[in-house]
């Protein structure tokens, strides 16, 4: 039976920083305010794999945002290596071969896979320029259904698409949303964004937040404010929670 996700565990702070020293300094500043961290490509290539392993050993949850997409054998073996770090989540692009291979690599481990539907920096015009005949919402829906059929654990998608996707995939797939900006924050390079409270109310399970926390004068206070927004939204909607 599913158990409750605490509001604090729903916030994933993106360590989009240039090096391990900067990331470790930020983790120290955040202290107990944050339990879940995302490590992306930039930090991974700067020594982030070791950091991920240390975070997991310290009891933090780790999301490796590597968006794997390669020949199946490479994806499977790379996923197996990530699983050995103790990470909780790993992203893979929402193509059937990559998703199937990643599942094989994660077999027998606690690692959960999140399929990337459409990058939150893309809009319909970007897809058209890349040769897609469908818009963002149609492509997100198609990839979400395929990911569920393959057995992927969750999805990465814009908060705008959570209400579209939830009826298609049911209650058990975790919906993890980047593009989260507290009211008044700079939108940066995201095109499909939403506030934390609205994202939770719309059906998101976990929220990825980077610069509004790591770029704040007081990162721990910024994180606590977002956690409070999440808790308030959960109370308002009476959300059924899952691990």
Curated annotation (Swiss-Prot):
Catalyzes the decarboxylation of orotidine 5'-monophosphate (OMP) to uridine 5'-monophosphate (UMP). Belongs to the OMP decarboxylase family. Type 1 subfamily. GO terms for molecular function: orotidine-5'-phosphate decarboxylase activity. PROSITE patterns: OMPDECASE. Pathway: Pyrimidine metabolism; UMP biosynthesis via de novo pathway; UMP from orotate: step 2/2. Its EC number is 4.1.1.23. It holds the Pfam family OMPdecase. It comes from the Bacteria. It catalyses: orotidine 5'-phosphate + H(+) = UMP + CO2. Keywords: Decarboxylase, Lyase, Pyrimidine biosynthesis. InterPro entries: Aldolase_TIM, OMPdecase, OMPdecase_AS, OMPdecase_bac, OMPdeCOase_dom, RibuloseP-bd_barrel. The keyword Lyase applies. It is an enzyme of class 4 (lyase). It comes from Bradyrhizobium sp. (strain BTAi1 / ATCC BAA-1182). The active site is at residue 67. CDD domains: OMP_decarboxylase_like (cd04725). Substrate binds at residues 16, 38, 65-74, 120, 181, 190, 210-211. The keyword Zinc does not apply. NCBIfam families: PRK00230.1, pyrF. This is Orotidine 5'-phosphate decarboxylase. Homodimer. One of its GO terms (cellular component) is cytosol. GO terms for biological process: 'de novo' pyrimidine nucleobase biosynthetic process; 'de novo' UMP biosynthetic process.
């Amino acid at each position: 039976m599913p158990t409750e996700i605490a509001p604090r565990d729903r916030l994933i702070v993106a360590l989009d920083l240039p090096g391990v020293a900067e990331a470790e300094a930020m983790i120290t500043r955040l202290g107990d305010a944050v339990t879940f961290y995302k490590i992306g490509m930039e930090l991974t290539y700067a020594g982030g794999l070791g950091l991920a392993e240390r975070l997991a050993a310290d009891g933090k949850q780790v999301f490796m945002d590597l968006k794997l997409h390669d020949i199946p054998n490479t994806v499977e073996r790379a996923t197996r290596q990530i699983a050995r770090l103790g990470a909780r989540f790993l992203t893979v692009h929402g193509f059937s071969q990559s998703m199937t291979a990643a599942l094989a690599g994660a077999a027998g481990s606690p690692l959960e896979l999140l399929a990337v539907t459409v990058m939150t920096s893309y809009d319909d015009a970007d897809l058209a320029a890349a040769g897609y005949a469908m818009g963002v919402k149609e492509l997100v829906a198609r990839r979400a259904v395929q990911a569920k059929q393959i057995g992927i654990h969750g999805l990465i998608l814009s908060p705008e698409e959570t209400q579209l996707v939830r009826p298609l995939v049911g209650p058990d797939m975790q919906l993890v949303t980047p593009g989260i900006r507290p009211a008044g924050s700079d939108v940066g390079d995201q095109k499909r964004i939403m506030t934390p409270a609205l994202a939770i109310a719309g059906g998101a399970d976990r929220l990825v937040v980077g610069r509004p926390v790591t770029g704040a004068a007081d990162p721990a206070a910024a994180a606590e404010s977002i956690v409070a927004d999440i808790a308030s939204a959960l109370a308002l909607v009476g959300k059924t929670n899952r691990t």
